[in-house]
A protein has these predicted regions:
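Signature of N6-adenine DNA methyltransferases within the class I
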Residues: 1-174
């Protein structure tokens, strides 16, 4: 926790942070990891601090069967290239292979346009997504809504929904 303040939740994110620290400025690193760091809320601080110093240039969500020889039908994999330089306007390439069947050979799916989906998005656009999740597939309208619209919590106080006032009278337990 002391050394890896934002990545101590997971050995994977500590590894990413350590590898990035070894890269010279404007240098590149490339890794194949599990993809949980891209979306889960507990990795938000890790994403924020990492993307403040670096830019994802390419990312491929491989999904299941990342390593067929390991029978990896449980862990979802992602391969990415990161540049140790903040470039907000850089248009990164993202490839999603997650839609292919779990048992499919990802090297074949990579060249098959039926399951493969390609996206281009800048680091600026990703900064507008709450939690800095790497949601490269978000449409321009969704990104615009996050950028320009107010959050619900900024407009009203959110709390529990409708309450009965007298649970014993109005709620039946079966």
């Amino acid at each position: 926790k002391r050394i890896y303040k934002f990545s101590h939740y997971d050995l994977l994110t500590m590894f990413i942070e350590r590898c990035n620290s070894l890269v010279v400025d404007f240098g590149y690193s490339s890794m194949i990891t599990m993809q949980n760091w891209m979306f889960l809320s507990r990795f938000e601080n890790f994403r924020v601090t990492t993307l403040e110093k670096s830019t994802i240039t390419d990312l491929m969500q491989i999904g299941f069967n990342t390593f067929p020889e390991l029978n990896s039908k449980v862990a979802l994999g992602a391969a990415f290239v990161m540049k140790k330089s903040k470039q907000n306007d850089f248009l990164a390439s993202y490839i999603d292979l997650n839609q292919a069947p779990q048992s499919s050979d990802k090297s074949e799916i990579f060249f098959d346009n039926y399951y493969r989906k390609d996206y281009k998005i800048s680091a600026n656009d990703l900064q507008n997504i709450p939690g800095r999740a790497i949601t490269y597939s978000a449409s321009s309208n969704v990104i615009k809504a996050f950028r320009e619209m107010s959050k619900v919590g900024d407009i009203i106080t959110t709390r529990e929904g409708l309450a009965t006032g007298c649970n014993d009278l109005f709620i039946r337990t079966w």
